[in-house]
């Protein structure tokens, strides 16, 4: 079978299902692909094709994730669904599946449950910007008042974590009935798809964001000056533009006097490309791996931040023993390790392998960072955890 050519004519948006175990996330994922395929074309995916999610590795952590795709008339969606709660935690913290928006599935028969709350909190911490609610199993609830009560509880829970609970779209449906082809419930899936289109704004593409390049290597070329190499994370760098060198040391300014790729000279380097950038007036020893080149004024160096962290279990190759306050591992940001100290939440004495935990980290050197930046926690080069900057403090 020949591979279909990928038509990139429509905007691409990343979404995923979140919510409590057995509330119907995977059934809903199957229903969306099935109903949209029937209505707009595309491939339907059966429940069992999605449920036996393959393993993948992200930052040294094994995660089971299913990826499906579907189309509405205006957009192309990539959708992630995870079989187990631990997979969600790992997925969201590592950013293995960056979500532009999430579909929170809540069974009308149960209402919000512990993992409902936990996934909303995680969404807030890791920067999922939009949540749409699918109230599932509504075919099993006859009482209109009960549905209204559950809806109210969900809205309150969202508001508690700073999502706009009162304005969040809530669709009442039945994923199973829609999957079985019941027209009344299929319409609810189309209603949900409509909200995906209207409520989640089109994400800003990496190339449209301000320029940033994590420095991997530094060379000096006699007669030309200092060259830094790395993969452009976002934006575009053009010859002649000013840049800042941020992190580890005092921030310095320079001008890009050349961009090259595979030994060819270019006018610009774009997001996703591996390039060398020639810098004016910078000595080889004034710059090092772990710093970033950035558009002036767009990113600052910080040492202290609040984070959400997942600690690998022993089976995942992590630590065999818990750690306590006073733990001083390395935090690997982009291209380099920086030692840091941790503060655990009130009342938490120790952290076990396999836990996810909120912690405040203080680094010994400043690193260029914004909220949402991912990092690994390492001990002597071995990954023992993964985290995300929830909030820069200083």
From Swiss-Prot:
InterPro entries: EF-Tu_GTP-bd, EF-Tu_GTPase, EFTu-like_2, EFTU_2, G_TR_CS, P-loop_NTPase, Small_GTP-bd, T_Tr_GTP-bd_dom
Taxonomic superkingdom: Bacteria
Keyword Magnesium assigned: yes
GO MF terms held by the record: GTP binding; GTPase activity; guanosine tetraphosphate binding; translation elongation factor activity
Keywords: Cytoplasm, Elongation factor, GTP-binding, Hydrolase, Magnesium, Metal-binding, Nucleotide-binding, Protein biosynthesis
SUPFAM superfamilies attached to this UniProt entry: EF-Tu/eEF-1alpha/eIF2-gamma C-terminal domain, P-loop containing nucleoside triphosphate hydrolases, Translation proteins
Pfam family, one: GTP_EFTU_D2
An annotated GO cellular component: cytosol
PANTHER family: ELONGATION FACTOR TU, MITOCHONDRIAL (PTHR43721:SF22), ELONGATION FACTOR TU-RELATED (PTHR43721)
Family label: Belongs to the TRAFAC class translation factor GTPase superfamily. Classic translation factor GTPase family. EF-Tu/EF-1A subfamily.
Oligomer and partners: Monomer.
Protein name: Elongation factor Tu 2
Protein source organism: Escherichia coli O139:H28 (strain E24377A / ETEC)
């Amino acid at each position: 079978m020949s591979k279909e050519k990928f038509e990139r004519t429509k905007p691409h948006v990343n979404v995923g299902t979140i919510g409590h175990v057995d509330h119907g996330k995977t059934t809903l994922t199957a229903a969306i692909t099935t109903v949209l395929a029937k209505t707009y074309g595309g491939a339907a995916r059966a429940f069992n094709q999605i449920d036996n999610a393959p393993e993948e590795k992200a930052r040294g952590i094994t995660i089971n994730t299913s990826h499906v795709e579907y189309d509405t008339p205006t957009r192309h969606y990539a959708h992630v669904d995870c079989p187990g709660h631990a997979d969600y935690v790992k997925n969201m913290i590592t950013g293995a599946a960056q979500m532009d928006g999430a579909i929170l599935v809540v069974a009308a028969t149960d209402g919000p449950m512990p993992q409902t709350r936990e996934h909303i909190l995680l969404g807030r911490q890791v920067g999922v910007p939009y949540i749409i609610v699918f109230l599932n199993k509504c075919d099993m609830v006859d009482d209109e008042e009960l549905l209204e009560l559950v809806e109210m509880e969900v809205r309150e829970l969202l508001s508690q974590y700073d999502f706009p609970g009162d304005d969040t779209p809530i669709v009442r449906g039945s994923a199973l009935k829609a999957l079985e082809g019941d027209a009344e419930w299929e319409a609810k899936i189309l209603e949900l798809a409509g909200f995906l289109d209207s409520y989640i704004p089109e994400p800003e593409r990496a190339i449209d964001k301000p320029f940033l390049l994590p420095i991997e290597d530094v060379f000096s070329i006699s007669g030309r000056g200092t060259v830094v190499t790395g993969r452009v994370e976002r934006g575009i760098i053009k010859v002649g533009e000013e840049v800042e060198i941020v992190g580890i040391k005092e921030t310095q300014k320079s001008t890009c006097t050349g961009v090259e790729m595979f030994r060819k000279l270019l006018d610009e380097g774009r997001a996703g490309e591996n390039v060398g950038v020639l810098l004016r007036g910078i000595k080889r020893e004034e710059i090092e791996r772990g710093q970033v080149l950035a558009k002036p004024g767009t990113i600052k160096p910080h040492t202290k931040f609040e984070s959400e962290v997942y600690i690998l279990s022993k089976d995942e190759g992590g630590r065999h023993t818990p750690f306590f306050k006073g733990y001083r591992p390395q935090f690997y940001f982009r291209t380099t390790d920086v030692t840091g100290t941790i503060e655990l939440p009130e009342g938490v004495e120790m952290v076990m392998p396999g836990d996810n935990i909120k912690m405040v980290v203080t680094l010994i050197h400043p690193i260029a960072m914004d909220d949402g930046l991912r990092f690994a926690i390492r001990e002597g080069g071995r990954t023992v955890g993964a985290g995300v900057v929830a909030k820069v403090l200083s």
